[in-house]
UniProtKB/Swiss-Prot annotation:
Source lineage: Eukaryota, Metazoa, Chordata, Craniata, Vertebrata
Subunit structure: Interacts with PPP1CA.
Organism for this UniProt entry: Mus musculus
Domain (Fibronectin type-III): residue spans on this chain: 312-399
Sequence ranges on the Cytoplasmic membrane side: 440-828
Tissues expressed in: Selectively expressed in perialvear somatostatin (Sst)-containing interneurons.
GO cellular component terms attached to this protein's record: axon terminus; dendrite; excitatory synapse; glutamatergic synapse; neuron projection terminus; postsynaptic density membrane; synapse
Protein name, as recorded: Protein ELFN1
Positions of post-translational Phosphoserine modification: S460, S646
Amino acid sequence: MAGHGWGTAWVLVAAATLLHAGGLAQGDCWLIEGDKGFVWLAICSQNQPPYEAIPQQINNTIVDLRLNENRIRSVQYASLSRFGNLTYLNLTKNEIGYIEDGAFSGQFNLQVLQLGYNRLRNLTEGMLRGLSKLEYLYLQANLIEVVMASAFWECPNIVNIDLSMNRIQQLGSGTFAGLTKLSVCEIYSNPFYCSCELLGFLRWLAAFTNATQTHDRVQCESPPVYAGYFLLGQGRHGHQRSILSKLQSVCTEGSYTAEVLGPPRPVPGRSQPGHSPPPPPPEPSDMPCADDECFSGDGTTPLVILTTLVPQTEARPSMKVKQLTQNSATIMVQLPSPFNRMYTLEQYNNSKSFTVSKLTQPQEEIRLTNLYTLTNYTYCVVSTSSGTHHNHTCLTICLPKPPSPPGPVPSPSTATHYIMTILGCLFGMVLVLGAVYYCLRKRRRQEEKHKKAVAAAAGSLKKTIIELKYGPEIEAPGLAPLTQGPLLGPEAVTRIPYLPAATSDVEQYKLVESSETPKATKGNYIEVRTGEPQERRGCELSRPGEPQSSVAEISTIAKEVDRVNQIINNCIDALKSESTSFQGAKSGAVSAAEPQLVLLSEPLASKHSFLSPVYKDAFGHGGLQRHHSVEAAPGPPRASTSSSGSARSPRTFRAEATGTHKAPATETKYIEKSSPVPETILTVTPAATVLRAEADKSRQYGEHRHSYPGSHPAEPPAPPPPPPTHEGLGGRKASILEPLTRPRPRDLVYSQLSPQYHNLSYSSSPEYTCRASPSIWERLRLSRRRHKDDAEFMAAGHALRKKVQFAKDEDLHDILDYWKGVSAQHKS
């Protein structure tokens, strides 16, 4: 005994050492590991506390997992999907009542599955899905009542199935038909209901060779007339006790016949005329029979009288749906004999059953509430007999998804209302836009009328001013009043005009010297062009130097010419065509009524070119230079005639030379006209008469006057020499040969416009220096008149510069005298 005790101890120590060498389990499971952490076996049986779910701390390389004798209630796909190498799974003796469809789909290597002694009620196709290599399936000692015909379709390699000790009443003929490798099928200890519906399975079972030979334990339990019958008869009296032979003899196309001896015995509780099945044949007696009455074989064979009866099948409970709502249902249950058995309505959910209500009426309506849409609910009529539940009929209800509420469909009246509202809004917008357009158009017309009225008033006012200014000079018989102006230089010189007594006779008048009583002159041409108001100078751009200042002043002349271009053409043509007789005059004072421009004549070279006059500050130095054009021929220049934009009476002037100015030979001299005769009478042909006569003639010269001039560089001014000594007012008079000076020390250079100044904004009168912003219609007009006017103004300016460039000395003098009067008119 002592040796045996020591041997047992050594075995336990060796087992413990082996388990520790293989690796101790994580948690409460014992693991047997291999190389590189590979786990062969995990024993998690009889855990304390017992597992209620499959543990997840086990290595996913496990091959054999044993979880028997725990409290696992369900098998989920998520708990088994990580064990891809699992081959053997033992879940025996748990509380499993629900297996998720496809729970074993990740165990494609599983060969042995033990689910015995659990609480499964149904066996469906989804529970065994994916077990293509499964060979041994143990489902004994469960609560299985229904085995679907397609339950084993995905397990073609099954060899052994154990469905014993369950509650199976019916099996289909095709339940095991596809299992070609099946050798053992244990179905004993099930309460089979022997009827013609079981005949197909009985035929398969008779053809199947079961290796275990447990036919004596497979019996019918119901109906009571066939209780105790074996599914397959064996032994001495097996043929008579086999339900297969009995059903084959009585079942034809859904009905069956039975062997009866004597009148049929009524079955208690099922005594309905025409509906009770025939009773089973009586048990054979052991009494010996007479020799002449005994048939061959063992024992006495009773005489059996075969009678064919019209069998009546037993009425079974029925269920149908009466009404379905979004969360409830009403079912109708009909019971053939509610008092023969105890019927209840059971709900099956995940292999679990719940009693809904007891059925005590032949026909009842049961309302089922708190249901969910898109969920299958299974209800069965169950009867209890000898502690066993029998399913008579089942019904599956699935509440459909409630239809989505239809969107608001506008009625025809509403749609019409919307359409009319939209059309009304559009029509209203059209009316508003039309009204706005009408108002703006009316306002534009009013503005145009106002502009025309203002332009007419301005023209009338200008004409009135001209008449008021020059009218007395034309009509007065005597001397016209003189306009006061600033004195020029140290001595004031004036030119006093005399008007003729009669228009028919041309008389000679002598010029008297007025230097003894100095008078303020109206201003010479230089002052007229440079004596600008302060506000006009502020509106112009700042001038970087004197050459640009001279360019700007020449530009102002070009700007004014565009408005009176036709008048200039007529005037120039008239002045060029008139025949004037010039008489020598004594150099002396100039008229104070009009500003005088003194011109310089110098010897002509072989080639002449027109240059703009240059004004200088000093007396007698750097005076105004006048170069004649190429067409001009050398000769004595004529005296200038003054035209101020209005028709003047013909008049004569007498010039008296008061002194002689001596300058160096290289200096430029200003000579208007000199003659040894002391007095010279200047006769001027009336310009207005010639203007009217030569109006048509002027159009012939339009083309060459509108040609654009070339660019000529301005001649730089000469440095001013020191001013000479002058006498007082009572001394020597200012000679006409001396250049007129400006009262302010500022040089002005009149030069031709270069192309870079052609786009300058300029004008020669204050009212055109700063223009008001155009109105809204002028800004929005597609083809504005401003571009056209600017083009005409530029063309007119170029035409004037062309005329000035090619004009001869007397024509140039007439143009400058004319603009002297126009500038004086604007200044006034």
